[in-house]
Amino acid sequence: MTEVKVKKGESIDKALRRLKRKLDREGTLREARLRKAFEKPCNRRRRKAKEARLKLYSSLY
């Protein structure tokens, strides 16, 4: 479980921003959204291939 401790004198908004950034880096929210509904194996392979193409394309430019 991901934890973010609120530092002394730190606002709640700042702590929430740190939590969101940490969850984004870990991919927790993204994985939860993907697992919300069943995804067929063929659709999963297709999605992963598309993500790989987009990642490769964006790294070239």
Swiss-Prot record:
Q: For this entry, list what GO says about its biological process.
A: translation
One matching Pfam family is Ribosomal_S21
Q: What's an example of a GO molecular-function annotation for this chain?
A: structural constituent of ribosome
InterPro entries recorded for this chain?
Answer: Ribosomal_bS21, Ribosomal_bS21_CS, Ribosomal_bS21_sf
**Known Gene3D superfamilies for this protein?**
Ribosomal protein S8
> What is the residue range of the signal peptide feature?
none
Query: One Gene Ontology cellular component annotation?
Result: ribosome
Tell me where on the tree of life, at the top rank, the source sits. Bacteria
Record keywords, A-Z? Ribonucleoprotein, Ribosomal protein
Give the family, as the similarity comment puts it: Belongs to the bacterial ribosomal protein bS21 family.
What is this protein identified as?
A: Small ribosomal subunit protein bS21
Q: Which organism is it from?
A: Methylacidiphilum infernorum (isolate V4) (Methylokorus infernorum (strain V4))
